């Protein structure tokens, strides 16, 4: 218990020696925090790009500067920042004079994700994670062999609860087909770009199909969640295995046919495939069913021998069987004052408005229940405004 001061007040007015006998003079909007023997300097722009906030590291022992690989999409530069060191290798960064939906960010410098990325990249790494108020419902991963009816079940959910569920838009490196729209059917991207983003840990799952990459990015899931909807991922067992190993906390459901004979009858009833294609799908389905039942990935297994009963069971699993369709509820924004001081008290951050004409407003951030993190969002923030004495 007790009060601890924030570590944001160092604006580097005297600069640092850059290791070559020349002082580096950060701009007066830069903010630094000290963790051990290293100062993390936040400000300016990233690699000359004025749209993204820069990060530099100064090692007090070697007196050298370094520019780390910065993962994730960070905050845009603004008129000033406050920063405070948090436990578990994170720095809370608050943008001054910004609305609450764009003011709270976390810079991860020594989390499990960062340590993993350092091993993969072989260099210094930091990562941004946007802070989001409140929690969100877990995304839903639904897998099953072709012809089992999982697409129909998902369509029924989307039709009955259009404001509750949403699809993530996958990425692919193949060329768009006729009538396909970028950002609607797929995010069409360059192979080199997608390979780099996969290496940077931005994808939950990916696969190479006929020489083209397909995958689900973390951002595409977060965008659905940010809109107030619960994200549904319709992916195969291989993709579900990758999602299970990621930082995403999801519900995993596998849809099984009542029998292989029933599945074969359904595939033949489509009348859209040759005998060779049907036999290939059956072989793939048999392998996928065995993997789905024995992999330990899926907490729930549904047997679709009756569509209406299976749909009712699915809704029960998701806790929505007796719910009426509802619209998403928007969280009211709170503007953070341009001039303020920051104090840390246990898991709470107290932001006190300062300057002339202030209204003695104090904003309290409760971080006791935060979850998630880079390369996705950090959720669970509780934010409130109180009158200070």
Curated annotation (Swiss-Prot):
List of residues binding ATP: 144-151, 304-305
UniProt-listed InterPro entries: Gal_Oxase/kelch_b-propeller, GK/Ca_channel_bsu, Guanylate_kin-like_dom, Guanylate_kinase, Guanylate_kinase_CS, P-loop_NTPase
Enzyme Commission number(s) of this protein: 2.7.4.8
Domain Guanylate kinase-like, residue spans: 137-319
SUPFAM superfamilies reported for this sequence: Galactose oxidase, central domain, P-loop containing nucleoside triphosphate hydrolases
Gene3D superfamilies: P-loop containing nucleotide triphosphate hydrolases
GO BP term, example: regulation of developmental growth
Disruption phenotype: Growth retardation, narrow and dark-green leaves with elongated petioles, root growth inhibition and reduced fertility. The double mutant atgk1 and atgk2 is lethal.
One Gene Ontology MF term: ATP binding
Key words of the record: ATP-binding, Kinase, Nucleotide-binding, Transferase
Chemical reaction(s) catalysed: GMP + ATP = GDP + ADP
Active site feature: 177, 270, 281
Keyword Transcription in record: no
A Pfam family the protein falls into: Guanylate_kin
PROSITE patterns (alphabetical): GUANYLATE_KINASE_1, GUANYLATE_KINASE_2
Enzyme class: transferase
Signal peptide (UniProt feature, chain positions): none
Family: Belongs to the guanylate kinase family.
Quaternary assembly: Monomer.
Cited function: Essential for recycling GMP and indirectly, cGMP. Required for normal development of the gametophyte and embryo, in association with GK1.
Protein name: Guanylate kinase 2
């Amino acid at each position: 218990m007790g009060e601890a001061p924030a570590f944001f007040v160092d604006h580097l007015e005297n600069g640092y020696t850059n290791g070559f006998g020349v002082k580096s003079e950060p701009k007066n909007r830069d903010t630094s925090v000290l963790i051990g023997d290293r100062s993390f300097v936040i400000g300016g722009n990233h690699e000359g790009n004025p749209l993204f906030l820069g990060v530099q590291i100064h090692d007090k022992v070697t007196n050298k500067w370094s520019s780390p690989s910065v993962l994730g999409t960070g905050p845009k530069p603004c008129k000033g920042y406050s920063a405070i060191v948090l436990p578990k290798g994170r720095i809370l960064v608050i943008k001054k004079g910004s609305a609450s939906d764009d003011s709270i960010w976390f810079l991860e410098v020594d989390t499990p994700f960062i340590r993993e990325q350092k091993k993969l990249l072989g260099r210094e790494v930091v990562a941004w994670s946007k802070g989001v108020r409140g929690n969100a419902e877990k995304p839903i991963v639904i897998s099953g062999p072709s012809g089992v009816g999982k697409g129909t079940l998902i369509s029924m959910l989307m039709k009955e609860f259009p404001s509750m569920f949403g699809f993530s838009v996958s990425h692919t490196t193949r060329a768009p087909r006729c009538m396909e729209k970028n950002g609607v059917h797929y995010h069409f991207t360059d192979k080199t770009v997608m390979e780099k983003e996969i290496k940077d840990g931005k994808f939950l799952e990916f696969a190479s199909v006929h020489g083209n990459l397909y995958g689900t990015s973390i951002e595409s899931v977060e965008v659905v969640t940010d809109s107030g909807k619960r994200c549904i991922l319709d992916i195969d067992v291989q993709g579900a295995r990758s999602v299970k190993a990621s930082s995403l906390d999801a519900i995993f459901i596998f849809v099984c046919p009542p029998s292989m004979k029933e599945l074969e009858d359904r595939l033949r009833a489509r009348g859209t495939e040759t005998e060779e294609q049907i036999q290939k799908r059956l072989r793939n389905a048999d392998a996928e069913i065995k993997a789905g039942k024995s992999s330990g990935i899926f907490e729930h297994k549904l047997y679709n021998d009756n569509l209406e009963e299976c749909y009712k069971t699915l809704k029960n699993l998701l806790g929505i069987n007796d719910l009426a369709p509802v619209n998403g509820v928007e969280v009211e924004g709170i503007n953070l004052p341009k001039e303020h001081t920051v104090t840390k008290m246990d898991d709470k951050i107290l932001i006190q408005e300062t300057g002339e004409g202030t209204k003695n407003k104090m904003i309290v951030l409760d971080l006791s229940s935060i979850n998630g993190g880079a390369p996705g969002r950090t959720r669970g923030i509780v934010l409130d405004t109180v009158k200070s004495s």
